[in-house]
């Protein structure tokens, strides 16, 4: 799976244990989803946040 699928579609689902919406992680476990958690101050593994807002452009 493309680790940055969330950046393109705004949603992703990782193995049923994790989901993202608009690049915000919901019920994610450690190193489950490569998307940005709320606040964009810290990112899941493999994701870099750009700027201070968390939207579909915050993942690369």
From Swiss-Prot:
Metallothioneins have a high content of cysteine residues that bind various heavy metals. Pfam families: Metallothio. A divalent metal cation 5 binds at residues 33, 35-36, 49. Gene3D superfamilies: Metallothionein Isoform II. Residues 29-60 are annotated as: Alpha. A divalent metal cation 2 binds at residues 6, 12, 14, 25. This is Metallothionein. Keywords: Metal-binding, Metal-thiolate cluster. It comes from the Eukaryota. A divalent metal cation 7 binds at residues 49, 54, 58-59. A divalent metal cation 6 binds at residues 36, 40, 43, 59. A divalent metal cation 1 binds at residues 4, 6, 20, 23. Belongs to the metallothionein superfamily. Type 1 family. Residues 1-28 are annotated as: Beta. Disulfide bonds: none annotated. GO terms for molecular function: metal ion binding. The gene is mt. The keyword Metal-binding applies.
């Amino acid at each position: 799976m493309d680790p940055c699928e969330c950046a393109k579609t705004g949603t992703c689902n990782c193995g049923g244990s994790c989901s993202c919406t608009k690049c915000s992680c919901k019920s994610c476990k450690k190193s489950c989803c490569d998307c940005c958690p709320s606040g964009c101050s810290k990112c899941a593994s493999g994701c870099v946040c750009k700027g201070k807002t968390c939207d579909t452009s915050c993942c690369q």
